[in-house]
């Protein structure tokens, strides 16, 4: 009997190692609710304790529960509100089966927590990852900790699917007014570039320099709130991804 994907995702208990630690964290079988104790999340750096995250998290998982079986073997876009807000994703890649797994407010530690149920259980054809701005802005995390968490995400994906392409997008520019100063984002992106360079089947997408102004900040005509891109921004992101998809041989859905 074929077990539905959602059932598998919600009943699977996995162990993830704390990044840089010795203890292993047993991820609860049901990750559809944000943990009451965010400090229990895997990974390094401060945990996200923004009060609104639990509601967004639960809402997104309720939506995905309805489409879990349909979302297999697609290109999974994984991230935070910037990914969640990509409403034209399917239209922008009409020849690909795209699956949006963005959660507003999420961080690298949250992605590590939900990676198996939200992504790996879907047998993805490829993964596009953009994550880290909330680690810097909401949590004041050290860029090296964020980079280590991203490295662990890449590792976890390739432990399950060793040959699928992973496209890691640089953290987009924002502003010090949003607690996301250019120097910290640039430092994080340098570390991301270094890690991607040494990871097989992993590709870097420049989503910083294509947007940043002369000060390294987000231009208001593309990021109206200095954090989230508008339609022009998503179009530029699409254009940056297309040649990478071709290089990685991420093929159109037949």
Where are these regions (language model features)?
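Extracytoplasmic/secreted proteins, especially bacterial periplasmic and envelope-associated proteins
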Residues: 73, 77, 106, 110, ...
